[in-house]
Amino acid sequence: MHIPKSLQELANSEAVQFLRRPKTITRVFEGVFSLIVFSSLLTDGYQNKMESPQLHCILNSNSVACSFAVGAGFLAFLSCLAFLVLDTQETRIAGTRFKTAFQLLDFILAVLWAVVWFMGFCFLANQWQHSPPKEFLLGSSSAQAAIAFTFFSILVWIFQAYLAFQDLRNDAPVPYKRFLDEGGMVLTTLPLPSANSPVNMPTTGPNSLSYASSALSPCLTAPKSPRLAMMPDN
């Protein structure tokens, strides 16, 4: 194991450079927010009422709301861990097709998670709004924390989708280059000559004239005729 000898060498190491990437920082925030959402409702999300020992969800006694938050938070946390592991191997991926497929999968999942967290935020906030006040002695702070970090998860997943889209644009497969021109995606390639394309070739023969010969100066193309000298008669 290599131990850095100075702070400059530590800052230039691969591990630090990997942690400083915007994609890595975003994934860390996604994992932390997901962990807060599902742990808050998993520990304090189920409480019993004063007149009954049976546990109920603190979000309007709707067990679906608590189950949704716990399940979505846990799956999102696992997704962040899996993509962090794949990001560490991104530089070792040699195949262009596999790398493009990985980036496309990252973009699709980021968009899906942004939609899931948006729907979850609306659902949890609605259930909390219809919850009777002071029905449960504990758990109100956990419910508010889960709803707040559900909203924050929407923002980080949208930013993750934006980063994945930028990677797709910058790492387009060769020989294609993708440019965003006034909202439209343009694909440009270098044209290759085909067998049916007309090619101007000089023809040979006694009756053929080339462009180069026609472009010569009149002095070279039209030689002067010899002059006849008149001799005096003695």
UniProtKB/Swiss-Prot annotation:
Transmembrane segments: 25-45, 66-86, 104-124, 145-165
Domain annotation MARVEL: ranges: 18-169
Membrane topology designation: Multi-pass membrane protein
Listed InterPro entries: Marvel, Synaptogyrin
Keyword Transmembrane: yes
GO CC terms in record: neuromuscular junction; synaptic vesicle membrane
Keyword field: Membrane, Transmembrane, Transmembrane helix
Keyword Cell membrane annotated: no
UniProt subcellular location: Membrane
Stretches of the chain forming a coiled coil according to its record: none
PANTHER family: SYNAPTOGYRIN (PTHR10838), SYNAPTOGYRIN-4 (PTHR10838:SF22)
Family affiliation: Belongs to the synaptogyrin family.
Annotated protein name in UniProt: Synaptogyrin-4
